[in-house]
């Protein structure tokens, strides 16, 4: 609703604006004496405990124009909303306008600007600021916890040298708490400033909606105050952000160091595992090479002992009992008949039991056995060092003989050219081609094949001549 305000520019003493018929009864709007064509009006300040009366001149700032305009909207009462030079907003109304504040038509007009108990000065923006305070406090509590944890974690790292090592934990915790408390205070101060700014902005919005003709000087001062408050708020916010950034950085640094240490530990574990696997592979290769070498040695031993299995000397009992050295020693050195029987018997008895433990043959033993002409037991010892003890097995159809042959040995006649030739030594035997030993008949022929169940790999030494 637009009114022609020019009709109130020149108000005489006998003129009356649209006020109540009896101003003394209806309100505090009273006529004053005429002074140079100007009319002054006393308006009561509603909401102030002192209930001050402020007088304004209608020609000074045009407030009367707004009073008349508002009176047409709310009845015969007068409502004024004035912004002071300090940026505060005052609401003025006649006494009978006060009940209209609770009504819907009055609420929609003045609820954002009138500071009364019925309408508390809390706006949506203020609510948001309160929520902001809560969020800031929550952040500060989180910072307290994080900073304390940081100090506790780094007490041993020399971060508290300035405290001379006295009560490092407590000093750090206290300093962290104090910093956080300061942050809380700064946040609260910022929010209070924001609340004031929001109130000012709301009041300015109300003034714009109600089209109040506030002087430009006051508007500019309000803007300056708002700008100053905004600058202060920005500075405080920046300071708070800096206070928050440093604890976060202090937390991130140990976390990064822990991650790097864990990665290094994992790399070390992987390197150790690879080294262990390499050692295992090397050990397996070494075992394979050792097995291969042992197999080669065993093959060589078998090749050496295999030759002794042949009845190259034609002397069956000597080969069967004493074995390996027949190829090298017994071809040219055939002992007498009776001595060979005794030596082969003793050799198989004494050396056969222990020969199982010796799987490798040293060919040097041939020389040793050949030189011990006077020791019958040396034959059995050398037989123990032969390749396989299985060569000392007696024929299956033979019973174990007694240690010493009880039968008398036959006499040994002189050699004769007509006798059968044994071996390569030129020695001739006058006996028949077969002989009896424990009931076992064996042909005595040079070219007769050896029985498969007679031991072949025992050692035969040169028979002593004086036995």
Curated annotation (Swiss-Prot):
Q: Which domain of life is it from?
A: Eukaryota
- GO terms for biological process? adenylate cyclase-activating G protein-coupled cAMP receptor signaling pathway; aggregation involved in sorocarp development; positive regulation of transcription by RNA polymerase II; regulation of DNA-templated transcription
Biased composition (Basic and acidic residues) is annotated at 206-220
Task: Supply the InterPro entries for this chain.
Answer: SRF-like_MADS-box (IPR033897), TF_MADSbox (IPR002100), TF_MADSbox_sf (IPR036879)
Residue ranges of the MADS-box domain?
36-96
Q: Which SMART domains match?
A: MADS
* Keyword field: DNA-binding, Nucleus, Transcription, Transcription regulation
Pfam entry (one): SRF-TF
Task: Quote the biased-composition stretches of kind Polar residues, using this chain's numbering.
Answer: 1-15, 442-467
Task: State the residue spans of region: Disordered.
Answer: 1-38, 115-245, 301-467
Q: What is this protein called?
A: Serum response factor homolog B
Organism of origin: Dictyostelium discoideum
């Amino acid at each position: 609703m637009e009114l022609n305000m020019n009709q109130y520019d020149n108000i005489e003493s006998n003129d009356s604006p649209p006020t109540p018929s009896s101003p003394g009864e209806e309100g505090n709007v009273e006529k004053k004496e005429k002074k140079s064509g100007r009319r002054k009006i006393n308006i009561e300040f509603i909401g102030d405990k002192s209930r001050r009366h402020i007088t304004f001149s209608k020609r000074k700032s045009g407030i009367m124009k707004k009073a008349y305009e508002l009176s047409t909207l709310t009845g015969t009462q007068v409502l004024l909303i004035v912004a002071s030079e300090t940026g505060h907003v005052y609401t003025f109304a006649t006494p009978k306008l006060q009940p209209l504040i609770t009504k819907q038509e009055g609420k929609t007009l003045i609820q954002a600007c009138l500071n009364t108990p019925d309408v508390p000065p809390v706006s949506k923006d203020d609510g948001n600021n309160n929520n902001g305070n809560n969020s800031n406090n929550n952040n500060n509590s989180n910072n307290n916890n994080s900073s304390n944890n940081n100090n506790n974690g780094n007490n041993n790292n020399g971060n508290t040298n300035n405290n001379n090592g006295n009560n490092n934990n407590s000093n750090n915790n206290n300093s962290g708490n104090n910093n956080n408390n300061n942050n809380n205070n700064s946040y609260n101060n910022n929010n209070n400033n924001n609340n004031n700014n929001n109130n000012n902005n709301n009041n300015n919005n109300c003034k714009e909606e109600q089209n109040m003709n506030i002087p430009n000087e006051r508007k500019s001062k309000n803007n300056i105050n708002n700008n100053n408050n905004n600058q202060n708020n920005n500075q405080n916010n920046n300071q708070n952000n800096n206070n928050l950034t440093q604890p976060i950085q202090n937390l991130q640094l140990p976390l990064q160091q822990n991650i790097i240490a864990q990665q290094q530990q994992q790399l070390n574990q992987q390197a150790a595992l690879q080294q262990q696997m390499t050692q295992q592979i090397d050990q397996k290769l070494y075992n394979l090479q050792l097995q291969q070498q042992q197999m080669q040695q065993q093959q060589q031993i078998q090749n050496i002992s295999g030759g002794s299995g042949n009845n190259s000397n034609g002397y069956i009992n000597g080969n069967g009992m004493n074995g390996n050295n027949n190829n090298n020693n017994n071809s040219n050195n055939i002992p007498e008949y009776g001595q060979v029987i005794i030596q082969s018997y003793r050799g198989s008895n004494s050396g056969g039991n222990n020969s199982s433990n010796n799987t490798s043959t040293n060919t040097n033993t041939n020389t040793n056995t050949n030189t011990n002409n006077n020791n019958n037991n040396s034959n059995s010892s050398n037989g123990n060092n032969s390749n396989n003890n299985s060569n000392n097995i007696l024929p299956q159809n033979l019973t174990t003989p007694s240690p010493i042959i009880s039968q008398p040995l036959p006499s040994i006649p002189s050699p004769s050219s007509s006798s059968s030739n044994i071996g390569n030594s030129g020695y001739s035997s006058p006996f028949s081609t077969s002989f009896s030993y424990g009931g076992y008949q064996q042909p005595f022929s040079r070219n007769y094949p050896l029985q498969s169940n007679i031991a072949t790999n025992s050692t035969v030494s040169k028979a002593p001549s004086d036995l």
